[in-house]
């Protein structure tokens, strides 16, 4: 049970006064309540000092991989979505033991995705929407649950995590605890996602869209690597650009609904050529061994990873 501090509890009259248009339905929007700012949530659920130091160390180690200073591989690993904190903490604690065996060659980043994009908009949308899948959506409790889960997973494992930024405005609720952010296949063409990613201070993986178009993905990387001015959470902001924005190949879906992989040698060679045609910093690619690449057959992932590693031997670039 989560007990909110007093400042989060408003009377019905106070909430009514804070709502746009006096709480009336306007243009089919019903404004329910004002949510706490990221600063308020971060103050109430602060990152412990030792975790903050750990994140700095992990971020530096991960950056060295993207900039070419380190020969280690990044492995972002975990379930499709994270909705049960106990189960997630149990998983990352076991992953930490694996990390001890491979840390001289690999950097393991637990995949703790608290938002779940839906193809049609229907279905469970993740922890932020419904911290309790058996109850109605509660975004206040969802934001708190998201932050607490990320803090607790690091405390449990010593491994800072990755999350998908389905909603760019949620970034600052967890920007002091995450070490990697993914922009999904359905979001990568969206301008707000691209511009927000240009202000992230951790690597941002820009997935190819569901169509599989490499140019869309690379345009997204270009946008994220450059500075921008835009509106963000009610503020006029400037960003400096994210030099760690990179590509993620996750397979595609054709017009007949058939999944098409894009992890083969020919795909990687094409991506390398396209990278060389553009002035992008720290060219890098992460292969998503699931989704359309595996046709969602999880047992295929081991074979896919082995093939990708073999492809690297065929071309030193």
Task: Pin down the residues of each PLM region.
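Short, well-ordered coil/turn segments that N-cap beta-strands
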Residues: 70-73, 102-106, 157-159, 202, ...
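Acidic (Asp/Glu)-rich catalytic clusters
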Residues: 66-67, 96-103, 152-156, 239, ...
């Amino acid at each position: 049970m989560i007990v909110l501090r007093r400042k989060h509890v408003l009377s019905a009259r106070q909430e009514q006064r804070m709502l746009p248009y006096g709480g009336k339905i306007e243009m089919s929007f019903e404004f329910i309540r004002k949510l706490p700012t990221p600063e308020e949530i971060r103050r109430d659920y602060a990152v412990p000092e030792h975790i903050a130091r750990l994140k700095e160390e992990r971020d530096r180690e991960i950056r060295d991989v993207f900039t070419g200073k380190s020969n280690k591989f990044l492995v972002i690993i975990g379930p499709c979505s994270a909705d049960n904190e106990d189960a997630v903490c149990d998983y990352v604690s076991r992953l930490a033991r694996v990390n001890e065996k491979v840390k001289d060659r690999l950097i393991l980043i637990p995949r703790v995705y608290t938002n779940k994009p839906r193809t049609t908009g229907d279905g469970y949308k993740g922890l932020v929407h419904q911290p309790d899948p058996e109850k109605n959506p509660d975004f206040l409790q969802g934001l708190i649950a998201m932050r607490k889960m990320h803090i607790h997973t690091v405390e449990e494992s010593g491994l800072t995590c990755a999350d998908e930024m389905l909603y760019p405005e949620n970034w600052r609720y967890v920007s002091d605890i995450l070490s990697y952010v993914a922009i999904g296949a359905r979001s990568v063409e969206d301008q707000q996602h691209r511009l927000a990613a240009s202000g992230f201070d951790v690597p941002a993986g820009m997935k190819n869209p569901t169509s599989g178009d490499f140019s869309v993905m690379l345009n997204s990387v270009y946008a994220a690597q450059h500075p921008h001015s835009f509106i963000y959470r009610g503020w006029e902001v400037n960003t400096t650009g994210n030099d760690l924005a990179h590509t993620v190949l996750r397979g595609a879906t054709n017009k007949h609904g058939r999944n098409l992989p894009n992890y083969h040698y020919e795909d990687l060679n094409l991506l390398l050529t396209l990278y060389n045609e553009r002035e992008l910093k720290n060219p890098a690619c992460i292969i998503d061994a699931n989704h359309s690449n595996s046709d969602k057959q999880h047992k295929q992932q081991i074979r896919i990873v082995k093939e990708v590693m073999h492809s690297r031997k065929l071309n030193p670039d």
